[in-house]
Amino acid sequence: MREIISIHLGQGGIQIGNACWELYCLEHGIQPDGSMPSDKAIGVEDDAFNTFFSETGAGKHVPRAVFLDLEPSVVDEVRTGTYRQLFHPEQLISGKEDAANNYARGHYTIGKEIVDLCLDRIRKLADNCTGLQGFLAFHAVGGGTGSGLGRLLLERLSVDYGKKSKLGFTIYPSPQISTAVVEPYNSVLSTHSLLEHTDVAVMLDNEAIYDICRRNLDIERPTYTNLNRLIAQVISSLTASLRFDGALNVDITEFQTNLVPYPRIHFVLSSYAPIISAEKAYHEQLSVAEITNAAFEPASMMAKCDPRHGKYMACCLMYRGDVVPKDVNASVATIKTKRTIQFVDWCPTGFKCGINYQPPTVVPGGDLAKVQRAVCMISNSTAIAEVFARIDHKFDLMYSKRAFVHWYVGEGMEEGEFSEAREDLAALEKDYEEVGAESADVEGEEDVEEY
């Protein structure tokens, strides 16, 4: 088997986790208590969904996941919620005191005490796997736990499981909506380590997803539940080929191989289509070509940045439902002829496609329409540098006055770490700029007409 362990950190990560596991259970027909009426071979671990669930002898299905927070309230909601019987109690770990939006508390003082316990749980889960493929880490980098403890945990995972892939689903601070004053500090400090310790990081931001909810689903005042269910659809589409059988299955390591041209340039954008409410879906065709075009719309991107301002280096299109390769090839060919969608000149093909026959599942009482087919795109575009530029600018404004820095230093962090992280991000912006530059200009001295 190719198992995957999910790690949900901090409030953001845990709440996305709730939405994801709710959706996985619906997709596989697993009841909230872990039983699965449709599973005939009890205790036999060769079903495709065993990548995400382990089976006990009694036929109960337990998620291969760890929920971790430094304060108890959010984990307690899982302990008392609908799916309380699904998880093993040891998989829900909570501390006593909060990271208080402070990266240094999550990374140095409070996080240090809990990280060994968490690694111990992860080791137990890993021992239970026959062929562990990698980790999915879910966290927000604006707060203290997701950024500080997230960094600590990813660093330790790199040491213990060096060769395994690590995919991060990272919620970045939005341009307009802010949940904490010190967000820019936390996210810059955390990104500094995401550069080294994740293989692919999918960027999400709340504001972009709010806009999608308002515009496409006609939800006037979207809640976090609306947002998380949308994110869960994306994550479910990315992992569908690991959990179901399909025509063109895509492995987790394939994302890496196809999306990451240089190790540092691994921050990717995601989009999903069709995102429409049930009323609208009734009147629309939603062919493969249509949903493919929709996935490339700047408005569909789940992070606030405009892909028209940059160039694509690569993109993965994951189709699910009633889709045949012929339609996919036709719609990809159409995309390639569009002037608005630019690829870098050193990457001529640029597309990786996956097809899975399992149609998208919707949560009962949710906002999305039940559709025959859907596509999820993750793309590596130079436009993502906009996100970093925005955060860096806010960081600079605060750091020039050394505002709030004493809270971090007081928790045992050195001030030099701020400037080191900031320089690393400046270098990252520069990297993106160079990657997007015309390659002919760079090699101006050499004779270009070699081939």
From Swiss-Prot:
Modification sites for N6-acetyllysine: K40
SMART domains registered for this protein in UniProt: Tubulin, Tubulin_C
Residues that, per the record, bind GTP: Q11, E71, G144, T145, T179, N206, N228
Enzyme active site: E254
Keyword Nucleotide-binding applies: yes
Pfam families: Tubulin, Tubulin_C
Residues that, per the record, bind Mg(2+): E71
GO process terms (BP): microtubule-based process
InterPro entries, per the entry: Alpha_tubulin, Beta-tubulin_BS, Tub_FtsZ_C, Tubulin, Tubulin/FtsZ-like_C, Tubulin/FtsZ_2-layer-sand-dom, Tubulin/FtsZ_GTPase_sf, Tubulin_C
GO terms, molecular function: GTP binding; hydrolase activity; metal ion binding; structural constituent of cytoskeleton
Subcellular localization(s) per the UniProt record: Cytoplasm, Cytoskeleton
Cofactor: Mg(2+)
One CC-aspect GO term: cytoplasm
PTM annotation: Undergoes a tyrosination/detyrosination cycle, the cyclic removal and re-addition of a C-terminal tyrosine residue by the enzymes tubulin tyrosine carboxypeptidase (TTCP) and tubulin tyrosine ligase (TTL), respectively. Acetylation of alpha chains at Lys-40 stabilizes microtubules and affects affinity and processivity of microtubule motors. This modification has a role in multiple cellular functions, ranging from cell motility, cell cycle progression or cell differentiation to intracellular trafficking and signaling.
Keyword check for S-adenosyl-L-methionine: no
Catalytic reaction annotation: GTP + H2O = GDP + phosphate + H(+)
EC number assigned by the record: 3.6.5.-
Primary site of residence: cytoplasm
Summary of the function given for this chain in its UniProt record: Tubulin is the major constituent of microtubules, a cylinder consisting of laterally associated linear protofilaments composed of alpha- and beta-tubulin heterodimers. Microtubules grow by the addition of GTP-tubulin dimers to the microtubule end, where a stabilizing cap forms. Below the cap, tubulin dimers are in GDP-bound state, owing to GTPase activity of alpha-tubulin.
Quaternary structure and partners: Dimer of alpha and beta chains. A typical microtubule is a hollow water-filled tube with an outer diameter of 25 nm and an inner diameter of 15 nM. Alpha-beta heterodimers associate head-to-tail to form protofilaments running lengthwise along the microtubule wall with the beta-tubulin subunit facing the microtubule plus end conferring a structural polarity. Microtubules usually have 13 protofilaments but different protofilament numbers can be found in some organisms and specialized cells.
Family assignment from sequence similarity: Belongs to the tubulin family.
The protein's name: Tubulin alpha chain
Organism: Euglena gracilis
